Amino acid sequence: MRLWLPVLLVLIAASAANAQDSSPPPRPSPDFLFGRPDGTLGIRTSWLTGRAGSDWYDFVTDQLTLEKKNFNGPTVGTDLGITLTPRVDLMIGFDYNQRTRASEYRDFVDNNRLPIEQTTLLREANISGGVKVALTERGREVGRLAWVPRTVVPFVGAGGGAMWFQVRQFGDFVDYVDLSVFTDVFESKGWAPSAHVFGGVDVRVLRRAYVTFDARYIWASGNLGPDWVDFDPIDLSGLRISAGINFIISEVR
């Protein structure tokens, strides 16, 4: 009897350990939300292809070693979406970009036969508001509380805003009256109204997050001021191709 008692205790302990090891795994988090989202908050990066359709671009690309494509570049932005209806969001956005390019005169050199060099900076910051319309239902209600988001939701939208811009050239320049070389800074900055249209798709990747791809065309132009006499307003329009991530905002329910 004394020999069987330790063996029995070992068997009981082993059975208890096996029972713990075979306990069911924890349940995964639910794949639904408690009610419709109240909005979204997102960040994105874009590639801007400027239209460069005004005479200022014609002048600097003709006289300097610049091309219109030199004014294309990356943009960063953020968006806040506020849900108005099951398919419509009010969008508030901010975009910023800056391009700095070095150049020299194509047809002139200085007295030492060295390049006449300068730097051109173009900076834009756009504050916008608009409406985003989903082309399909963004989700479905299950019961009284649960809401299941769709995986893919295409959308379109439009809006307007205000764009702050700065154009700055600094370095050495040629006086076309006597062909002398001088050092100077030319600058213009201000605000201009803007308008835009856009379309894209939201792709759900997490319970509360979407990856967003969109294309947006923006119209804007700004007066250059006295440093560029007799020039038309500078063209600030262009196409932005964007990718970003949006996080769902909802009240605690």
Predicted segments with their positions:
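Internal, hydrophobic beta-strand segments that form the core of beta-sheet-rich folds
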Residues: 214-217
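Extracellular/periplasm-exposed beta-strand and loop segments of Gram-negative cell-envelope proteins
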Residues: 50-71, 96-127, 163-192, 220-238
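Positively charged n-region of N-terminal signal peptides that target proteins for export
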Residues: 1-4
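Bacterial N-terminal signal peptides
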Residues: 6-14
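Short glycine/proline- and aromatic-enriched beta-strand/turn motifs that initiate or cap beta-hairpins
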Residues: 19-82, 167, 242-253
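Gram-negative (and chloroplast) outer-membrane scaffold detector with strong preference
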Residues: 45-47, 81-174, 241-251
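Outer-envelope beta-barrel architecture signal
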Residues: 33-41, 74, 86-88, 123-125, ...
